[in-house]
Amino acid sequence: MAVSTGGADWRDGATAEQVAAVEHLYRNHRSLPYISPERDLAAWLEEVGVSSSKAVPKWALEPVADIELYGGYLLEVTAGDIILLWRISFDTFTTQSWFPKYFEYTYGIDAAFDLRMLVEAGLVEIESAADSLDLVTAPALCKALKDAGVNGLSGTKKADLMRLAREHLSPAQLEDTVPVRSYMLTTAGRALLDAHPGMVAKHPKKG
């Protein structure tokens, strides 16, 4: 997938020799993988010199699906995007979740940027504040409800606090109460993930 670094580019802090080394390393790949401007290029190039397995494999940059976005922009979905969909499928990925380094170093994608594109493509959606109440602690829910004039909450279970929050808090109050949101797959996102079981099977699993 095409990537954006918000104006920053890894080449800005690299020497001419390092740029040439990276371009030579990936000369037979479809495109250059994403490289964070914060990466220690000298150390990484030294690791690659010892073991080529430290480089992004050629297959990881090959598109597995093309999706047209608004304005005719073509979104090229690669293996890293499938793994990102897989991570989201566990329903534990939130707007505060961190992205493992393998997205950059193994799959060659800027995961944060790609996630925004997957949302724009309708493959992933950000849950509403009301649907993300499970991410809020019980004490925080109690405070929000008390601030809204709801009393008698002592000993109330979290599930009931969530229900009361949906019933008594205005949309604006919910927005303030739920700073973190969950990501979830849409039907299209689930279908795309299910169409590529081999990608998930190839991904290293802990344990």
Regions found by a protein language model. Give the residues of each.
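Basic helix-extension-helix modules of the SAP/HeH family
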Residues: 3-6, 10-207
